[in-house]
Amino acid sequence: MEESKTPHVAIIPSPGMGHLIPLVEFAKRLVHLHGLTVTFVIAGEGPPSKAQRTVLDSLPSSISSVFLPPVDLTDLSSSTRIESRISLTVTRSNPELRKVFDSFVEGGRLPTALVVDLFGTDAFDVAVEFHVPPYIFYPTTANVLSFFLHLPKLDETVSCEFRELTEPLMLPGCVPVAGKDFLDPAQDRKDDAYKWLLHNTKRYKEAEGILVNTFFELEPNAIKALQEPGLDKPPVYPVGPLVNIGKQEAKQTEESECLKWLDNQPLGSVLYVSFGSGGTLTCEQLNELALGLADSEQRFLWVIRSPSGIANSSYFDSHSQTDPLTFLPPGFLERTKKRGFVIPFWAPQAQVLAHPSTGGFLTHCGWNSTLESVVSGIPLIAWPLYAEQKMNAVLLSEDIRAALRPRAGDDGLVRREEVARVVKGLMEGEEGKGVRNKMKELKEAACRVLKDDGTSTKALSLVALKWKAHKKELEQNGNH
């Protein structure tokens, strides 16, 4: 069979578009640079979403997809946290994954590697049964990866809740992080989400390598520390920034309208405001943000979602039913119509960030969004909401110094005065100049590392060569 001569890699993304998108970029590089074939094995608790299908259907023919039957999570309560749901989806998909691997064997296409992402380590069981080397694609920072690798030890040595720690956690090469800023599933050690986080991190040592979506100039000290050989520490390969910077088609007139509006604004004058496809604010915080943007007197393009009490409430359903514009303060649209453009739900983000009129990005610090900003050289206002975003915000504002971070009051609310101060500071102030210059440097570095002789390209080549060597070995042993 002709195809069996080409190394074949199976990739299992955790549920959620934020996990799929960087893996798609990773797969494209494997195909374009190394001539590999890739199969995405998609697990989920329902039928594939339209967004998933659109992304997967647009890929080159050497990247195919298999959709596993939905898993049954009806035994979980409505309060079950997202990390538990994601982990259980992968774990309960193992019987179906075995069938897919059987079909690979029958077709002479046994993968030379299985790649999972951060919560998918239970799929290693299937990889081991079929003698396929397991790898992890880690879609966030080297700093958070260091935390994941250290968590089993931390769990044994700390008895209190991490938020009660009086000293910040100091990991080699990493920015010090207070316990209250640890990622969400580490905030309640009695919750199943923490147990699943711990369960997955304990299995990281079983991987034959970890590919991380970052690059040396962005996190030099953390990457150096991770690459020092150590017990229970697989080799780490920084292969980022893997982001989709190709042209997204603005699907509706409203979406292309926002780009037309940007065309008419002065160079670098617009603050782009978006909390990602999963992030929402409370009613009160939405109100304060709106009034702060108005008071700042800066130009802005705001992707708005209806408020809710849960920061990641639209993680699986990015179009809540209510019109978000009805939640804006009275008179806000009229007051800001000359300077602001408000768009519900979604904007073509890569195009907005690459637009010459965009000069800043108020972001939830999701890592995909952060890397898109780095690639376009756009300085940040860090406004973390959920997952590991607080850890990212600390890294971006205190270590990399590519972001300003507004201060919240004791009640967790960022007041309008603080919003206005930070927005003005980024777009007009001295502080803004510093982060702008830093982002310019990082943009150039991001471009360099992905060139043919760049560090991230070389790191990916090392892994691809390993996989090709494994394929040759299998052929010599007469095993397809």
Curated annotation (Swiss-Prot):
Annotated binding of UDP-alpha-D-glucose, by residue: 277, 346-347, 364, 367-369, 372, 386, 388-389
Catalytic site positions: 19, 117
Stated consequence of mutating residue 19 to Q: Reduces N-glycosyltransferase activity. Loss of O-glycosyltransferase activity
UniProt KW Signal keyword: no
Gene Ontology biological-process entries: lignin biosynthetic process; response to toxic substance; xenobiotic catabolic process; xenobiotic metabolic process
Gene3D superfamilies: Glycogen Phosphorylase B
Binding residue positions for UDP: 277, 346-347, 364, 368-369, 372, 386
Reaction(s) the record says it catalyses: hydroquinone + UDP-alpha-D-glucose = hydroquinone O-beta-D-glucopyranoside + UDP + H(+)
Top EC category: transferase
The organism's place on the tree of life at top rank: Eukaryota
Pfam families attached to this UniProt entry: UDPGT (PF00201)
Phenotype of gene-disrupted mutants: No visible phenotype under normal growth condition.
Xref: InterPro entries: UDP_glucos_trans, UDP_glycos_trans_CS
Claim: Transferase is one of the keywords in the record: yes
Family: Belongs to the UDP-glycosyltransferase family.
Function, in words: Bifunctional O-glycosyltransferase and N-glycosyltransferase that can detoxify xenobiotics. Possesses high activity to metabolize the persistent pollutants 2,4,5-trichlorophenol (TCP) and 3,4-dichloroaniline (DCA). Also active on benzoates and benzoate derivatives in vitro.
Full protein name: UDP-glycosyltransferase 72B1
Classification of source organism: Eukaryota, Viridiplantae, Streptophyta, Embryophyta, Tracheophyta
Gene: UGT72B1
